[in-house]
Amino acid sequence: MSTPLRPMSTGEILDRTFNLYRNNFVLFAGIAIVPPALMLVVQLIQAGMVATPGHPRATTAGFAAAGGIGMMLGVFAYLVGLAVAHAATVFAVSAVHLERTTTIGESYGRVKGRYGRVVWVIVQAALRSFLPAILVIIVAAILMPLAAKGGGKAGAALAGVVIGLAIIVAAIMGLVLYLRYALAVPACVLEDIKASAAIKRSVFLSAGSRGQIFVIYFLMGIISFIVTWLFMIPAAMLAAATAKGSPALAALFTGLAGFLAGTLAGPIATIALSLVYFDQRVRKEAFDLQLMMAAVDGTPLPGAQAASAG
């Protein structure tokens, strides 16, 4: 390996992220294209169900119910596709970072049979992180009317402030907890372990680097926002100029913009987090030495160390 694995700073991880993305653009964009394509299909189907002149059936209750069910199924398919693409991207990063070759098909093929496991990892991480915040919001929704009814305007105002602060604190706690599980998918994919074990591995590996992970999420969020609006603004202008009276055509323009933005920006955060995973294994488990001891190229990456069990 011409570039041995070594500990990297946040700046070096970001630099390596963009180098890998730029040098393997077709690979990463090709993997990332699946979820935006699924969402585009969902948006176009939904647009086709919007009431238009000459199509009164679009306003019937049965048609609306069918559209709602179709929309939910489409969103579910999109989320599953997003999880699978995330896993395939992780494998692709492991290959190119360790100077091996791979393709779009091979990256998806290597995670075949682990789709359900990856989805369950993501669901577990989300529930562990944000379920408390959701419960706080539900309690707030129940208490607000009671406070307004029993305490007058002053009591309602005070209750609103307290409940609002509780929701904010719960949301912040959820985000902090989510940082603990940011490396669960790389652990699941590259070490071929169960969802619960991947969650535990992420807690161990992310310890001491959660500030770094937060910075990466924050910067990648900004990049995604900018890329999205670079496509959305022209699409909205084009729709306003040419798609008057045609919701389907307007949805096509905005859907294509979202498709392009998702394909281009989607893989970047996953690349960065995969590199954080490698960095933490180098720091905590001397992963560079383990790798040099591997017998042949293509050998599965060495798994969890006993030290990570806690």
Name the predicted role of every residue range.
Residues 4, 53-54, 58, 81, ...:
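Juxtamembrane transition segments at transmembrane-helix termini in multipass membrane proteins
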Residues 20, 24, 28, 36, ...:
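Generic N-terminal helix/loop capping motif
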Residues 41, 76-88, 92, 96, ...:
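Mid-bilayer segments of alpha-helical transmembrane spans in multi-pass integral membrane proteins
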